[in-house]
């Protein structure tokens, strides 16, 4: 784990936020920067507790740490029982809740993620010479049903019905880490937690959303995040590579292909604002795959969340969201 002390505003891959503070600390977990901006009595103790929490969470939920819960599940044989920690069961239950509403949010898509070389161990961002063929994708999809993962919340046991089934909480873990860190800092006067671009704050802040296809401006819009709310953004510009001049990104739909990859009007990014960073994280992935429709509006309403969806030359918005656009494409 790496820790850095800074007094400057930091620009990140997907989101930039500005907040005045005396100091901030950056830790590296989940293969990303985790920024802790808090001030108040006993703030140093709170930061120490947050660092310990992030370390434990990463070691529990990572797909790349050998002895994590997720790695143990992924390496297990069919019907081999694995006993896991409370956060794993909590996220399995929450993921199932969202999956049952719309199966596009599927933590069991990880065999497809690996097939396309988007796992932490294989992704490089360098243009590739080939992509998976349809037959290979079809075989991998056979192991990608979330129904292959079975767990018992009463004793924290998990097993798989398919040896090749694997899970990945990449679409929800940063939000969980953000909410948990925020809770540990709840007695502080000023709080902004930023876990790889998933942000939660106890006071109103302005967040700059990166322009997915920057030409004139680095940022596409500014969103006002109310107090005790969070924001998460998913986009096709975060992890991608090119093949035959076509961009392939890391967010997969149920066909086993990157969402919108062959569309003439693809979604480029989705930002969700709401009270739960975990839910914002999950819904930004879900809406990136599905776009804004009646069903997505219902789930946003159920979770008291708002959405901003950016296309190449227009946008869609749902809910009470204060947005100022900075890029001419969206004015």
Features from the language model and the residues they span:
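Mature catalytic core of soluble alpha/beta enzymes
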Residues: 2-8, 12-331
């Amino acid at each position: 784990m790496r820790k850095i002390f800074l007094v400057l505003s930091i620009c990140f891959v997907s989101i930039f936020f500005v907040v005045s503070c005396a100091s901030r600390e950056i830790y590296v977990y989940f293969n990303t920067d985790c920024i802790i901006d808090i001030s108040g009595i006993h703030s140093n103790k709170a930061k120490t507790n947050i660092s310990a929490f992030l370390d434990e969470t990463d070691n529990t939920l990572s797909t790349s740490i050998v002895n994590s819960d997720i790695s143990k599940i992924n390496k297990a044989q069919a019907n081999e029982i694995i006993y896991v920690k409370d956060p794993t069961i909590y996220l399995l239950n929450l993921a199932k809740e969202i999956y049952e509403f719309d199966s596009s949010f599927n933590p069991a898509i990880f065999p497809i993620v690996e097939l396309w070389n988007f796992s932490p161990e294989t992704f490089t961002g360098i243009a590739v010479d080939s992509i998976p063929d349809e037959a290979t994708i079809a075989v991998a999809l056979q192991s990608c049903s979330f129904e292959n993962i079975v767990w018992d919340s009463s004793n924290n046991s998990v097993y798989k019905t398919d040896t090749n089934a694997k899970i990945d909480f990449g679409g929800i873990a940063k939000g969980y880490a953000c909410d948990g860190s925020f809770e540990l800092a709840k007695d502080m006067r000023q709080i902004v937690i930023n876990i790889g671009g998933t942000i939660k704050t106890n006071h109103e802040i302005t967040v700059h959303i990166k322009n997915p296809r920057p030409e004139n401006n680095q940022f596409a819009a500014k969103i006002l995040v109310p107090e005790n709310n969070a924001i998460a953004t998913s986009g096709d510009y975060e992890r991608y590579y090119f093949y035959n001049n076509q961009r392939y990104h890391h967010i997969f739909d149920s066909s086993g292909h990157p969402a919108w990859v062959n569309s003439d009007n693809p979604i480029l990014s989705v930002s969700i604002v709401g009270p739960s960073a975990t839910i914002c994280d999950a819904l930004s992935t879900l809406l990136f795959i599905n776009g804004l429709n009646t069903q997505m509006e219902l789930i946003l309403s159920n979770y008291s969340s708002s959405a901003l969806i950016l296309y190449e030359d227009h946008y869609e918005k749902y809910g009470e969201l204060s947005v100022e656009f900075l890029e001419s494409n969206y004015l």
